[in-house]
Each structure stands twice: as structure tokens, then as C-alpha cells.
Regions:
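Switch II (G3) loop of P-loop NTPases
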Residues: 1-9, 175-181
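Short gly/ser/thr-rich secondary-structure transition/capping motifs
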Residues: 2-7, 39-43, 155-156, 212-215, ...
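Inter-motif core of Ras-like GTPase G domains
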Residues: 17-27, 201-204
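Structural beta-sheet core signal
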Residues: 21, 60, 80, 204-206, ...
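Acidic, Mg2+-coordinating active-site environments of NTP-dependent enzymes
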Residues: 22-174, 253-254
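Active-site beta-alpha connecting loops in nucleotide-dependent enzymes
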Residues: 156, 184, 191-260, 266, ...
Length: 311
């Protein structure tokens, strides 16, 4: 099998001719490509799924509202998964233990739940794993191969990547790097960090990605980022866009502060980050580097040297 990870960002997934498809969620993003028209955005997903052959099911997450709303519009076989009571493959008894997630999957026509583990924290990763298992089961892959493959899966780069320890004169912090840059992605990553490190403080360094995304989801970002225990904001990574007034790091910080959520620190020069971190990090903190821009370069530099001095 050839497995392709694709998204709707530029609608290029419409050129694929998949034999099976797995849809995890449908939520407004990349709207600049669709000229802000959500109906066009949904039409892209419909077109993608209608590229499936008549015998190829769409495996879809019933926990996601966008997915649930789309299912009645499809003229293809649909197999569902998730925690939802009506899911064909139902995720149950989820629990987190460190950087691992454990759950059971209740399958159609099988009396015994399938006990599964995946080496990534967070309910969203358990949901994604459930979707992968559902698709494998529909392909006829053996139960033993599914359990073994999932247990051996090491994750993908920049998705809650554990990059080890970062040290400075007063102690060390655990470095986690994550690519998520949509409010929902940031929210589930924060929750995963709480699940994995429930007795440790999470210090988030967040780099907003695109002025249009920051503008379009401003209130959502304020609510989600306000949940961090300590927040450092970098300037927006423009990705070729022109600046938009009120859609920058300073505006986010003011809105978070005005709601009394926390007191963010804004850094306009990335060379200042090391000094700021040295002043706010405590021993055993979790340093969560979050965003899709060049913040990944900063994470890599920290991981390579194991020291704040690398910045």
C-alpha cells in the first residue's frame, strides 16, 4: 500500500485518486485559497471523497461536527470511528500514561474490545489511531499486525516531538516541539502536554502563522492561548502575507491580558528568546515550542546543543 497524508490547503488533494480515504476533521482553515467561502471549502472535501471508487469506503471521525455534517451529502460507503456512541469503531476507556495513550476499540461484529497503545499522548492521537485501525480492519489486515504496528509507531516529526532536555544554569526543562498552528491544534496539544506531564508546568512559546489565520481565528486563539500556564509570543510568521492591523502578536497579548487570563511576554527579536527563557523557566518545566513557521529551527537548535545558549 502507498499511504499519502494530504490536506485541503491548496485543493491539490482533488488530483488524488485514492482507493480508501480517512478524514479526521473538517474545520475552517486555509480559507485564503477558497476566497473566504466556506461552501467552496466543503465542496472540496465532497469532491475529494467522490473520487473514491464505489467499493472504497470513506473512514470518517464521527466525533467531529464538520465530518458529521458532511456525511449525509456523500454518495459513497462511509465507515465511522470515534468516541461517539454511533461510531462503527468506537473508542473507549482512553487513558494517558506519560507519553503513551491507551484505549480500547469496540468493533462491529466483534464481541471483545481490542486493547491498543500508541506512543503519543493526547486524546486526539488516540482518535487518529482509532481511525487508522478502522481503515486497516476494513482492508483485512490481521489483528496481530494492527496491534504490533501501532505499538511500534514512533510518531512523525514536529507533532509533539520529544526532543530531550534543555539545560541552563538553574536546571533543565523537557523540550517538546509541535507544528500545530490552528486554534484546535494548539488546544489539543496543550491538553496532551497536561495529560503527559500533569504535575509539571508547561511554558509555551507560540509563533502565530499567517496574518489571515490570526485575524480569522483571533478570538479562538485568545481563548486557547490563555489556557497556557506561561505564554511567550513570537511575531507572526507571515508566509508571504502582508501585515494586517490587529492580527499580530501584540494584539493577541493585549486581548489575552484584557480578559485576565495571563500575562503573555511578546518577543519581537528571536535573539531575545534565550534570555527570556532563562528568566522564566524553572527546573522540570515543560518547554512547548508551537507553530508552523521558523520556530522549528529554534527547536532544532535547542535540541542539537541541549542548552539555551544555542539561541
Amino acid at each position: 500500500y502507498l499511504v499519502v497524508e494530504a490536506d485541503e490547503s491548496d485543493a491539490s488533494f482533488l488530483h488524488l485518486q485514492p482507493m480508501r480515504a480517512l478524514v479526521t476533521n473538517i474545520e475552517a482553515d486555509h480559507m485564503e485559497h477558497y476566497e473566504g467561502d466556506f461552501s467552496r471549502y466543503i465542496q472540496a472535501f465532497t469532491g475529494f471523497l467522490h473520487n473514491l471508487p464505489f467499493y472504497g469506503p470513506a473512514v470518517m471521525c464521527l466525533d467531529d461536527k464538520g465530518v458529521r455534517d458532511l456525511i449525509p451529502e456523500l454518495s459513497r460507503q462511509v465507515v465511522t470511528y470515534g468516541r461517539h456512541a454511533d461510531a462503527d469503531y468506537r473508542l473507549d476507556n482512553y487513558r494517558s500514561a506519560g507519553l503513551c495513550s491507551h484505549f480500547e476499540l469496540i468493533r462491529p461484529h466483534d464481541a471483545a474490545p481490542l486493547a491498543l497503545s500508541v506512543n503519543m499522548p493526547g486524546l486526539h492521537n488516540a482518535q487518529n489511531a482509532a481511525g487508522a485501525v478502522a481503515l486497516c480492519a476494513e482492508l483485512g489486515i490481521s489483528e496481530d499486525a494492527i496491534v504490533r504496528g501501532l505499538a511500534e509507531f514512533g510518531g512523525v516529526g514536529r507533532r509533539f516531538s520529544d526532543l530531550g532536555e534543555v539545560r541552563w544554569s538553574a536546571g533543565s526543562a523537557r523540550l517538546i516541539d509541535d507544528y500545530g498552528h490552528h486554534p484546535t491544534e494548539v488546544a489539543v496539544t496543550l491538553q496532551a502536554a497536561r495529560d503527559a506531564f500533569h504535575d509539571q508546568r508547561v511554558v509555551m512559546v507560540y509563533q502565530p502563522h499567517r496574518f489571515t489565520r490570526t485575524r480569522d481565528h483571533f478570538d479562538e486563539f485568545v481563548s486557547v492561548l490563555g489556557e497556557a500556564q506561561f505564554l511567550i509570543l513570537l511575531d507572526v510568521y507571515a508566509a508571504g502575507e502582508s501585515a494586517i492591523e490587529g492580527a499580530d502578536a501584540q494584539s493577541l497579548a493585549r486581548a489575552i491580558r484584557a480578559r485576565g487570563l495571563l500575562e503573555p511576554v511578546v518577543i519581537s527579536d528571536q535573539r531575545q528568546l534565550a534570555a527570556v527563557l532563562a528568566g522564566v523557566l524553572c527546573d522540570r518545566d515543560i518547554l512547548l515550542m508551537q507553530g508552523a513557521g521558523d520556530i522549528g529551527r529554534l527547536s532544532a537548535a535547542l535540541a542539537d546543543s541541549d542548552s539555551l545558549e544555542a539561541l
